[in-house]
Amino acid sequence: MNIGEAAKKSGLTPKMIRYYESIELLRPAGRSASGYRHYNENDLHTLAFIRRSRDLGFSLDEVGKLLTLWQDRQRASADVKALAAQHVRELNRKIEELSTLRDTLQDLVEHCQGDHRPDCPILKDLASGCCH
């Protein structure tokens, strides 16, 4: 199948497929006599794997490691688990950061009168981060 068909079936854009190929997450596509890329079912499985990994928030480097493990039939599942567990720890750290940001902003929203007066604690807080 050509790149357009592979894109449609994988849910990725042709640009992303070419990018994944350029950074070697996807093997170089075969070429037709006219030079068009040609993808097979194995490529579609790899693209689905990449897409799902990215949907779960894995970095491109992590996706590469996961692909290597996926393709290695002699892999130890402990290696996969360790990589996934590290990712969970990173997600938890990011969630904590976002929760703190949300709480701070919620507090500012609650203290803003939201009326016709120009006084606004949200803007004061934003301006206070500059030039100490």
UniProtKB/Swiss-Prot annotation:
Disulphide bonds in the chain: none
Pfam families: MerR, MerR-DNA-bind
Compartment list: Cytoplasm
GO molecular function: copper ion binding; DNA binding; DNA-binding transcription factor activity
Residue range(s) of DNA binding per entry: 4-23
Keywords from the UniProt entry: Cytoplasm, DNA-binding, Transcription, Transcription regulation
PANTHER family cross-referenced by the UniProt entry: HEAVY METAL-DEPENDENT TRANSCRIPTIONAL REGULATOR HI_0293-RELATED, REDOX-CYCLING DRUG-SENSING TRANSCRIPTIONAL ACTIVATOR SOXR
Record protein name field: Uncharacterized HTH-type transcriptional regulator PA4778
Organism per entry: Pseudomonas aeruginosa (strain ATCC 15692 / DSM 22644 / CIP 104116 / JCM 14847 / LMG 12228 / 1C / PRS 101 / PAO1)
